[in-house]
């Protein structure tokens, strides 16, 4: 496997290292073979979990196979955060990345906040716009989103339901 541009890293409560990278940024200069004729030269899945020794524990991620019942994967992967309940939060900073995603630490989709490709600007309480970072406050179970690439704010949602709380 090859890594594309690495755009996020976090350490969970078990001291595991989580990495998100951009598989679509590998090219012929990275010895990436477009016809995938060798295992060595394929991009890794976007989300990677490592132990402290650098051993790969698992990998997952990418577009949902059924968008009607799934989620909208980021156009450009950007940012990863593992919360106090071991949920993995992801964001993107591509032009259509107006949502954030929540998964279990095994890669099962849980929640999407926002609709991909829709933004109403900095006063929009339903969508983000190229989120810069995510953090969850355990005491209130609120997710704080640094929504600063496309908007200019920090917006807060309920981490379980995705309901808007405040800006």
Could you tell me what each predicted segment is?
Residues 1-167:
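Eukaryotic scaffold repeat domains enriched in small/polar residues
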């Amino acid at each position: 496997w090859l890594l594309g541009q690495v755009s996020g890293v976090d350490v969970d409560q078990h001291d595991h290292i989580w990495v998100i990278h951009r598989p679509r940024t590998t090219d012929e200069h990275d010895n990436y073979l477009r016809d995938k004729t060798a295992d060595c030269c394929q991009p890794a899945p976007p989300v990677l979990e490592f132990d402290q020794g650098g051993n790969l524990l698992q990998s997952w991620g990418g577009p949902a196979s059924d968008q009607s019942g799934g989620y909208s994967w980021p156009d450009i992967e950007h940012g990863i955060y593992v919360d106090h309940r071991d949920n993995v939060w992801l964001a993107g900073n591509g032009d259509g990345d107006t949502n954030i995603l929540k998964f279990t630490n095994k890669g099962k989709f849980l929640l999407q906040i926002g609709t991909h490709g829709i933004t109403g600007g900095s006063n929009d309480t339903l969508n983000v716009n190229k989120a810069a970072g995510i953090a969850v406050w355990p005491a209130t179970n609120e997710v704080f989103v640094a929504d600063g690439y496309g908007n200019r704010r920090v917006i807060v949602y309920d981490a379980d339901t995705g309901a808007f709380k405040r800006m």
